[in-house]
Amino acid sequence: MGFPEAKWAVDQVVSKVGVQPNNMRKFEAVALNETTIGLTFLEPEDSYYSAGGALAAVTKGVLIRMSTDGYPQDINDGTLVVDNTVLGKYENEYFQVNGLTKGTKYYFTAFPYSNIGVYNESLNAANKADAIPNALEKVSVTINIDDTKRFTSTTITLKNVNTSEQTTMNITEAKTVMFEAKATNTYVVTATAVTGYKNGALSTEQFTAVAGGSRAFTFNFEMGFLYGIKFDNGGDGIPSSYEYLEDCAGFTAASVSTMNSWLGKRILDKFKPCLIKPGATAPEYYLNKDNYNQRAEGSTAPILTGADGDVMIEAERMWFKLVKNGDSTATLYISEVELDGYKSFIGNQDVAYRGAYEASVSGGVMRSISGVAPAVNSTRATFRGYAKARGGEYSQNDYYLLRLWQCMYLLLYGTRDSQTAIGRGRSASGNQSAINTGTMNAKPFCWGDTGGSNGMKFLGVENFYGNVWEFVDGLTIVDYVCKITEDPSKYDDVGTSYEITAGTVPSGANGSYIKEMQATNDAPFLPSVVGGSETTYFCDALWTNSGTRVPIFGGAWGNAGGVGAFFWLLRSDASDASAGVGSRLCRKKVSS
């Protein structure tokens, strides 16, 4: 204990000088410019011997002293700054101490005193403050980059909101840079976006610079994945002829449920099974990817039969591009971030939803629930109406979502022979009917076998192909010309209002095997040339006819080899309905 503290304690014990006031309720020092420090303070309240007891000390004022050698130790130490008796005057406004030396640290001690002249000289921390005069605040900005291979540069800007003045620095690597901000001015720090990285332009909240102060900001640049696969498209005819490019160069493709190099990659996290209700802005909850009988979190069993909503796969937005090469190959790229020339799989939505099961219908309303027979024997238009009856955000088996699943299949498995890569699906010629929905609830997220009876599952979607054919909406073939819309409000069976025309399919195909795809962003896997076989090129067949035709995809329970990821039936009339043709519920995101 120092002498002043000891003296104070003794004085209290022997009651030589009466009761001293309590400590300051507020005492702060801040640099205002290169030669001025501002003090804000609030004197102690009057003190009492006990709660509700007699008055012990009445606060009259505060004496503040200053030194450059350390905190003044008593009421005579250092230089007098102010003797204030207007209590509360400087609680929210500065008492300015002028004429100071830039860069020198100044120490202040407050000595509150009573109406009988008793000072609090306890040197309590509440009675001390210090600051260094400086007109500027130092601002550091740190750039972190998780992977630099596509990083070009970002421009960091410190902008003065008051004057519009700004200072910029061009950054090409991970580093920390320093700026200076004028005291009392308002600023914002920004960083421009970098192509290929997940974050867009970055910005801080506005802040007011404090003289002599410092603050630090960090901007993290996380590179989005970019995967590529170059595949045969009418060249050597070998289904397994492909080459992985970009971030998946050197990968080993998936095989049935074994994801090999794709295991744990972020792209698989873009697909999540969930329960979602009409009008909801988010799912009720998510499911265990490899066992729909369990929630992703928590021990409560999920309800897959309708009460908790429809069982659907939530697909996050990604971008893709198809390039048709000059050597009878094509290249598919899938990017986590938007790049020039790339197309969003799901438009401007953050997420979209595709039924985990084939559609069922109850009371004229389409559902995606477990434990029921797939709905069949309706026209495409009728199924469209059933989907709309579920809610304005619903549609049936959107072409743009089917396109996403086709692209993902090719990227993950490489080979165009899907029945070999992931399973035959329910397709054996001896099958007499479709299997019910939910028979693969406990199977892995990607699953299949070679028996032809048990179905298959890809990215959570049961019977991606096989079991029942599925109508596809948003695509209509008019005299072999592909008419496409990505706006479900335009869905019809004639395609006259569809905004995209995407090439032609081969005329007169009658179970002809596909040799070459259009390989464009709008029509990546709509056929352009036939002449393959069940074991060459795309290993899947095509039927076409003239006139206006509604598309059917995938194959059915007894088609043997006639099912697959690229199997198209493009010869059906709008009036066609069949016991082997169903649909699938799809859904847009509902904004909050």
Residue ranges and their predicted role:
Residues 227, 403, 424-440, 464-477, ...:
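C-terminal, surface-exposed recognition/capping segments
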Residues 97-119:
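Beta-strand-rich modules
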Residues 1-21, 113, 130-136, 218-223:
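Short, low-complexity N-terminal tether/leader segments at secretion or assembly junctions of large
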Residues 126-136, 194-223:
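Structured interaction patches on ligand/partner-binding surfaces of diverse proteins
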Residues 115-121, 179-207:
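Surface-exposed interfaces of beta-sheet-rich extracellular modules
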Residues 46-84:
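Extracellular low-complexity, O-glycosylation-prone stalks/linkers
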Residues 302, 306-309, 337-464, 468:
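Short aromatic-cysteine micro-motif
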Residues 13-58, 102, 118-136:
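Pro/Thr/Ser/Gly-rich low-complexity, intrinsically disordered linker/stalk tracts
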